[in-house]
Amino acid sequence: MMFSFIVHVFISLFAVSNPIGNVPIFLTLTEGYTAAERKAIARKAAILSFFILAAFLVFGHLIFKLFDINIHALRVAGGIFIFGIAYNLLNAKESHVQSLHHDEHKESKEKADISVTPLSIPIIAGPGTIATVMSLSAGHSGIGHYAAVMIGIAAVIALTFLFFHYSAFISSKLGKTEMNVITRLMGLILAVVAVGMIGAGLKGMFPVLTS
């Protein structure tokens, strides 16, 4: 049971963060950097992203109380939001919430350290990823549950680091067509996850649906 939940967490976060699709963005941002510099940036971005997502996992319930957020409403809203990202992925488009605006891209190129922004936020730990983590933590308080989500986060972040570290190699082996196929597959998986979140939220808001 716990293993299947960890797999669910991993698939959900992997699909919404889409580390494979972010490889071209990483290569663009680190153009002109040495392999060692790229590795250092990828490592720092991964560590920061892990702590950001872990913070939302641990303190998510406090955010619920502070803003009087209904758990079921969050699942519906988060599901709709994530479905929007899935729709863009299915059409091989970049999600606006995870892609860079012109000013952000220009600013990131002028800075020596891009690991905090835009890599950690919004590329790795973007709104969709944060919403997914908060939804997964909603309504649960057991240590085992939090540990399972934390393991899922760590696994996705570790894979993201590896994809960034070997980004040049991956880009040379996978053409644009292959990248689009993978992106659409991630979109399909994410759409299924989003529909499940919306369904769970609606059942919680309207118990009559379960009768």
Curated annotation (Swiss-Prot):
Keyword field = Cell membrane, Membrane, Transmembrane, Transmembrane helix
Gene Ontology CC, one term: plasma membrane
State the membrane topology.
Multi-pass membrane protein
Keyword Nucleotidyltransferase listed: no
Which compartments is it annotated to reside in? Cell membrane
Membrane spanning stretches: 1-21, 47-67, 69-89, 114-134, 150-170, 188-208
Instruction: Return the InterPro entries for the record.
Output: Multi_antbiot-R_MarC
Main localization of the protein?
membrane
Stored NCBIfam families = NAAT family transporter
Concerning its family, UniProt says: Belongs to the UPF0056 (MarC) family.
Name of the protein: UPF0056 membrane protein YvbG
Source species of the chain: Bacillus subtilis (strain 168)
Question: Gene encoding it?
Answer: yvbG
